């Protein structure tokens, strides 16, 4: 896969980024270099390689999953103009 000047300009337009002609030409080379590196990575044989989440072996800290109300409901609605039993009240918008 390769990137051409039209693709760079299209992506810049979609991202709403102003890119000069010189910058766009430079980006063509940079993006093609990145894509070439990604293609090299996809060619590496990783069969038998164990997936890892860190470069150093460590156990993830876990906590028990407990359902709570968070004890913050009153704080959350404290600045709301109108509430009812810790719920925000808003004007009806759909009939």
From Swiss-Prot:
E.C. no: 6.3.5.-
GO biological process entries: glutaminyl-tRNAGln biosynthesis via transamidation; regulation of translational fidelity; translation
* Annotated Pfam families: GatC
The top EC class, named as a word, is: ligase
Q: Which GO terms describe its molecular function?
A: asparaginyl-tRNA synthase (glutamine-hydrolyzing) activity; ATP binding; glutaminyl-tRNA synthase (glutamine-hydrolyzing) activity
Q: Which UniProt keywords apply?
A: ATP-binding, Ligase, Nucleotide-binding, Protein biosynthesis
Q: Does the keyword Ligase apply?
A: yes
Which reaction(s) does its UniProt entry say it catalyses? L-glutamyl-tRNA(Gln) + L-glutamine + ATP + H2O = L-glutaminyl-tRNA(Gln) + L-glutamate + ADP + phosphate + H(+); L-aspartyl-tRNA(Asn) + L-glutamine + ATP + H2O = L-asparaginyl-tRNA(Asn) + L-glutamate + ADP + phosphate + 2 H(+)
What PANTHER family has UniProt attached to this entry? GLUTAMYL-TRNA(GLN) AMIDOTRANSFERASE SUBUNIT C, MITOCHONDRIAL
| Assembly and oligomerization | Heterotrimer of A, B and C subunits.
**Family to which the UniProt record says this protein belongs:** Belongs to the GatC family.
Function description: Allows the formation of correctly charged Asn-tRNA(Asn) or Gln-tRNA(Gln) through the transamidation of misacylated Asp-tRNA(Asn) or Glu-tRNA(Gln) in organisms which lack either or both of asparaginyl-tRNA or glutaminyl-tRNA synthetases. The reaction takes place in the presence of glutamine and ATP through an activated phospho-Asp-tRNA(Asn) or phospho-Glu-tRNA(Gln).
Query: What is this protein identified as?
Result: Aspartyl/glutamyl-tRNA(Asn/Gln) amidotransferase subunit C
Gene for this chain: gatC
